[in-house]
Amino acid sequence: MSDAPAAVATPLLEAEDVRKTYRLGAIEVPVLHGASLSVREGEWLAVMGSSGSGKSTLLHILGGLDRADRVGRNADGGEVRFRGRAIERLSNRALDRYRNREIGFVFQFYHLLPELSVVENAVLPALVGQVPLPWRSRRHEIRERAIDLLERFGLGHRLKHRPRELSGGERQRVAIARALANRPAVLLADEPTGNLDRKTGGEILDLLAEEHRRGLSIVMVTHDAGIGERADRTLWLRDGRVDESPDS
C-alpha cells in the first residue's frame, strides 16, 4: 500500500483574496477586503451576510459579471478560478462562454422578458450562446431541455403564458429553468426567495434542493439563516471578508 497522500481535488469554483471598491466621483466605497472561498463539485454553499455586506458583489465577481479591483502596477485585487483556471485571464470571448455555459444565474427579481412566453424566456440565454451546427438540431435539444425543466417545476400547463399571467413563485421557477437550460456547472443564486412569501419561498428552495440532489453545485447568498440551513456548508461575509464562523 502506498503511503503517498491522496490527491486534493481542484475546487470547482474559488475566489482568493478578492477586493472590490466602488468609486463615486472622488468618493471610494470599499466593499470586499480580501474575500476568499471555494465550492466543490456537487456542493451547496451558502454565504450569509447582512444587507450591504457585499454578498451580491462577491457573487457577481464569481460569475464574471463584475471584476475585482486592480491594485498597484504588479498586483491585483484577487483572483477567481474555475476548475483551476483564472477567469480574469480569459479572453472576452472565453469569458462570455464561461458566463453563458458554465454559470447559471438566479436573482431576487426575475428579469423575464414580458413579450416572450414562458418557454421562450427559458430557452433564450441558451440559444444566444449557441453557434455550432447543425443549428436546428441544437435548437430542438435546448427547447426540449427547457420544457423538461418547466414540467418538472410544475409549469407544463404554462408554457405559452406571458410573465404577467404568472404568480411570483411561478416567475421564479421560470427564471430557475432559464438558468439551468444550458446545463451549467454551478448555479449562483442571489437571494432567490427574497421577493416571495415564506410558503412560496420554501417551495423554491425545495425545487433547488431537488436539483442539488441531481448533482447541481450551488452558491447562494442570503441574509436568512433558515435558508442557510439548507446548504451543505455555510460561510459568513462580514467586514468585506469571508469567515467560517457565525460569530464576529
Segments (PLM) and residue ranges:
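Catalytic Walker B motif of ABC-type/P-loop ATPase nucleotide-binding domains
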Residues: L187-D190
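Short coil-to-helix segment of the ABC ATPase nucleotide-binding domain corresponding to the Q-loop/switch region
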Residues: L116-G129
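Conserved ABC transporter NBD signature motif
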Residues: V71-A86
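Conserved ABC ATPase signature
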Residues: R162-L166, E170-Q172
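Conserved catalytic motifs of ABC-family nucleotide-binding domains
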Residues: R183
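ABC ATPase NBD coupling module
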Residues: A26-V29, I87-G104, R139-H140, R213
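Helix-to-loop junction immediately C-terminal to a conserved catalytic motif
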Residues: G63
